[in-house]
Amino acid sequence: YYMQTTGNKRHALVMRAPNADLARDPRWGRTEESFGEDAFLTAQLTIASVRGLQGNHPRYWKTASLMKHFLANSNEDGRDSTSSDFDTRLFHEYYAYPFYKGITEGGSRAFMAAYNSWNGIPMSIHPCLEEITRKQWGNNGIICTDGGALKLLIEAHKSFPSFAEGAAAVVKATTGQFLDAYVPYVKEALEKGLLTEVDIDKAIRGNIFVALKLGLLDGDNSRNPYLSIGKNSTETPPFMTAEARRLAREVTAKSVVLLKNK
C-alpha cells in the first residue's frame, strides 16, 4: 500500500511473494529471497508470510500473496529450460510441500509457475497445475506464468512450433495470467479452434475470485477496510510506524545465523 501516495495512486494488489521454492544450490540467483532447503521450515515461513500479507479479515485481503516459483527451479545454469526429474513422492513430501502448506494452511490462492520442466513437461503447461493444485489442494485462485515463459515454451523447451499453440496449452492448463504479450496469440488460438471460450473462462475464474477478495468488484460502496490505507497523506503508513520499524529491526537481528567451518 506504499503505492497509494499522491504521486502514485494505486496499491499493490498482488504481491509476488513469498518465494516458496526450495534453495538447494547457493549459486541460484533467487537464493537471497528464499527460506532455504528445509521443506518443513520453508513451509512454516511461507504460511506465516502469506497470512501476514493477506491479513485476518473474514472477507477481504490486504493483498493477495502469490507464491513462486512452482517448482524445483533452484538450479542456476539452464533454469529457464532444463527439466527437474524426480518421482511423485519427492514432489509431495519435498519440492511441493511449502506450496501445499501455503495454500491449505496459509490461505494463499495464487502462485507463479516456474520456467523449468518437471519430468520433461514445462511447469507452465504441466497437468499438475489443475490436477493437483486445484483439484486436490483447493487453489481456486490465480496461476500465472513467469516473465518470458511463453517465449521459452517455444524457443527453449521447443514444446510447440507456434506461439498460438503454446498460448493455448498454457490456458488449457488453467493458467489465467501471462507475464508476456499474449493477446494476439490467444486470439489466434481461439480463431483456429485450438482454444474455446470455455477454456478461457475456466482459466480466468481464479482471477475473478482474487479480485473479489481484494474488493475490486465492489464499486464505490466497498466495505473493504484496507482500501483506505495510504489515502490520507498525513497518516503514517502501517509499515513506517515506530512499532513496525522496531519489529523489523528485531526480526532482522534474530534471523542472522552464524556458520563456522570446522
PLM segments and residue spans:
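Glycoside hydrolase catalytic-domain context in secreted enzymes
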Residues: Y1-K262
